[in-house]
A protein has these predicted regions:
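Metal-cofactor-dependent catalytic cores
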Residues: 1-148
Length: 148
């Protein structure tokens, strides 16, 4: 089974729950147009596998991921430099998103430290869009182009 995009979310402002959309436009050298992280060079896009959300009883966007995929549970463990193609867009993995207590606060967790520990190794991959930009849509296939 191929991995596929199952949810897309835009963070239009910090501190506000992201808005679900069916299509986004990825911008070379950064992230997703209309997202508050678009100009970041190393932490522009968070890609997360649905299995993490399901294991923790969370909904799409709760971990502030822009792209939720299904079928690649190892996405959090992809080495920096790994290249992904989502639809026609290419992204470079810059590393794992380190769990913090802030995400627990955003999700009203009663024990933010326990929530942080539960996310260890499952928080997703932080990425940057490389030279190939364009649209990403719910349903797009996700492939690993180059493993680092």
């Amino acid at each position: 089974m191929s991995a596929r995009v199952v949810s897309l979310n835009l963070h239009e402002r910090h501190g506000v729950h992201p808005r679900a959309v069916t299509e986004v436009r990825a911008r070379s050298g950064g992230g997703i147009e209309g997202d508050s992280h678009v100009s970041r060079d190393r932490r522009a896009v968070l890609v997360l596998d649905r299995s993490t959300l399901e294991a923790l009883g969370l909904a799409f966007g709760d971990l502030r991921e822009q792209i939720t995929i299904d079928g690649m549970p190892e996405v959090s463990r992809l080495a920096p430099g790994t290249e992904l193609r989502i639809g026609g867009v290419e992204l470079r993995v810059n590393g794992e998103c380190e769990p913090c207590t802030h995400i627990g606060e955003l999700n009203d967790q009663p024990d933010v430290e326990a929530f942080r520990v539960a996310l260890d190794g499952r928080r997703g991959a932080v990425c940057t869009v490389t030279m190939v930009e364009g649209p990403i849509r719910v349903g797009d296939v996700v492939d690993i182009l180059v493993r680092a």
